[in-house]
Amino acid sequence: MDDNKRPLYLPFAGPAILEAPLINKGSAFSEEERIFFNLEGLVPYAIETIEEQASRAYDQFRSFNNDLDKHIYLRNIQDTNETLFYRLVQNHISEMMPIIYTPTVGLACERFSKNYRRNRGLFISYPNKDRIDDILNNSTRQKVKIIVVTDGERILGLGDQGIGGMGIPIGKLSLYTSCGGISPAYTLPITLDVGTDNPQLLEDPMYMGWRHPRIGGEEYAEFIEAFMQAVHVRWPDTLIQFEDFAQKNAMPILERYKERYCCFNDDIQGTAAVTVGSLLAACKAAGTELNKQRVAFLGAGSAGCGIAEAIVAQMVSEGISDEQARSQVCMVDRWGLLLDNMPNLLPFQQKLAQKCADISHWNNFSDNISLLDVVNNAKPTVLIGVSGAPGLFTEEIVRAMHSHCPRPIIFPLSNPTSRVEATPKDILHWTSGQALVATGSPFEPVVVDGETYEIAQCNNSFIFPGIGLGVLASGARHVSDAMLMASSRALAECSPLAINGSGPLLPKLEDIHSVSKHIAFAVGKVAIEQGLSLPASDELLMQSIEDNFWKPEYRRYKRTSF
C-alpha cells in the first residue's frame, strides 16, 4: 500500500504540529484533524488543497523582484511546510531550480550569516570535536539515509565561505528530493566548521561560525576521521556525499573513505558522470564515438581531472588502451599544458600529464603551452572548461577549433554564470551554429541564422539524485566506479538530440523524475551484479525504486491517544 494512502499516527498536537515542517499542512488540515489535534483557530477557517496552497505560494514567489529574495522566500516555505515546498518546486522545476541551487545559492552562501533565519541541518565545529556523537544525536531526523557534507572551503567558484557553505548541502538535498524522490525525512545537511581563511568573514561582526583560521594537516584529518566514524555508528547505512571541499582535501578524502563507507564526491565523481553522459550523447548526435575524440581541458583541478579520468575509463571500455586514451586528453591549467617533466604536479595530475617526447614536434613548443597552442597542435574535437575563470574560451580559440572540427563539442562548465569560459551565444555564433554546447549553469536559448538552439545544462542534478535513489533502492554498500559509469550511460540514453536528432542535448528538467528512475535502475543493477547489495531481480529493483520515490502529497493524520 502507498505510504501516502496510509494514515500517519502522531503523538502530539497543537502548535507543535504547525512548527514541524515535515508534517505541517497549514490550511490543508481537514476538519477532523483540526479537532483531534487541537488546531481549531490556529489556522484560517477555509480548508485548502495542496494545489490551492501552491498557487498562492507561486503568486507570492513571483511578487519578488530579485532572485535572492525569491531564494529566501522558498527557504522560508521549506522551513515551515516541506511538502508544500516540494509540490511548488515540482510544479515549476525549470523556473525554481536556478533559485534554490545554482546560480542563486552562491549569493545565498555569501550572505548566509546576514540572512540567517532558522536552523536547518547540523553544524559540527572543531571546538566540539569530542562531542560529535552527541551532536549527531541532537538531529531531529532519526532515519537519515543521505547526508551532504561540506567544510565550506571551495563553494562553487566563490572560494572560502566558512559556515555560509551550508547553503550548498541544503540546496543539494533539496534536489535529491525534488529530482530524485528521496523523502526529505531521510536527508541531513551538515557543515563541518573548521574555521575560515576568508578575512572578510573573520572581521564580519555578523559571521556566525568559529572565528579562527582554518585548521589543516593532522588536526583536520583526525577531525574528518572522527566525523566519518561517528556517522557510521549513528547511521551505518547512510550515503555520504562530499561537497565543495578544497582541491587539496577533496581527492585525499575520497580515496581514504570510498572503500570504507558508502560515499562519493559530487564535485569529482558526479561532475565527471554527468559530463561523460553528456559527451556520450553529443558523440551519438554527431555520429561518432567517444574513443575517437581528442579532448582538451581548461582547468586541471580535482574536478577537471576527475572528469578526465572518467573519460579515459569510458574510452577504454570502448576498446582502446589506457595509454592511447590518455594521449588523447590534454589538461591545461594556469601554467599551461600539463607535462610529465613539470615539478610539483599533484598526484591526481601526474597520470594525465602529456609526455614531452610525444609533443616535441608541436609548433611553438615551449615550457608554457597555452590552450590556443593545444588547439592548433592537438586539434581537439572536445573542449571542456572547469577553470572558474570567465572568458578564456576566446573567439580565436573557438574558431581555430572549428576550422579542423565541423561539429566541435564545447562544454564551458564553470559556475556561476559570471565565471563561464564563454557564453553559448558566442560559441554558437563563432561556429555558425555547429557546436554542440552544454553549460554548467542555465542559459536562455540562442538564435543563430533564424534557428533556435536550446542550451543543455550539464548539471549534476541529472546524475546525483538518480545515484542516490539507486543506492537506496538496491541497498548498495559502496558507490563503485562501475556504478558511476552506468549512470553516465543511462543519462546518455535519455538525450532527446541523440534519440531524435533534434532538441536539446540533455533532457528537460520536467522529465527529471523519469531520468532519475532510469539512472537509479542502471546504478542499482550494477551494484547487484558487483555483489555490493543483496541479489534482486530487475522487477524487484524497479519496485524498490518506486517504493522509495517520495511524492509531495499530504498524508492523513491520526492521533495516537484517540
Swiss-Prot record:
NAD(+) binds at residues 154, 267, 415. InterPro entries: Aminoacid_DH-like_N_sf (IPR046346), Malic_enzyme_CS (IPR015884), Malic_N_dom (IPR012301), Malic_N_dom_sf (IPR037062), Malic_NAD-bd (IPR012302), Malic_OxRdtase (IPR001891), NAD(P)-bd_dom_sf (IPR036291), NAD_malic_enz_proteobac (IPR023667). Keywords: Metal-binding, NAD, Oxidoreductase. Its EC number is 1.1.1.38. The record marks 267 as: Important for activity. Signal peptide: none annotated. Divalent metal cations. Prefers magnesium or manganese. One of its GO terms (cellular component) is cytosol. The active site is at residues 101, 172. Its cofactor is Mg(2+); Mn(2+). CDD domains: NAD_bind_1_malic_enz (cd05312). It comes from the Bacteria. A divalent metal cation binds at residues 243-244, 267. GO terms for molecular function: malate dehydrogenase (decarboxylating) (NAD+) activity; malic enzyme activity; metal ion binding; NAD binding; oxaloacetate decarboxylase activity. It catalyses: (S)-malate + NAD(+) = pyruvate + CO2 + NADH; oxaloacetate + H(+) = pyruvate + CO2. GO terms for biological process: malate metabolic process; pyruvate metabolic process. Homotetramer. NCBIfam families: PRK13529.1. Belongs to the malic enzymes family. This is NAD-dependent malic enzyme. It comes from Shewanella oneidensis (strain ATCC 700550 / JCM 31522 / CIP 106686 / LMG 19005 / NCIMB 14063 / MR-1). The gene is maeA.
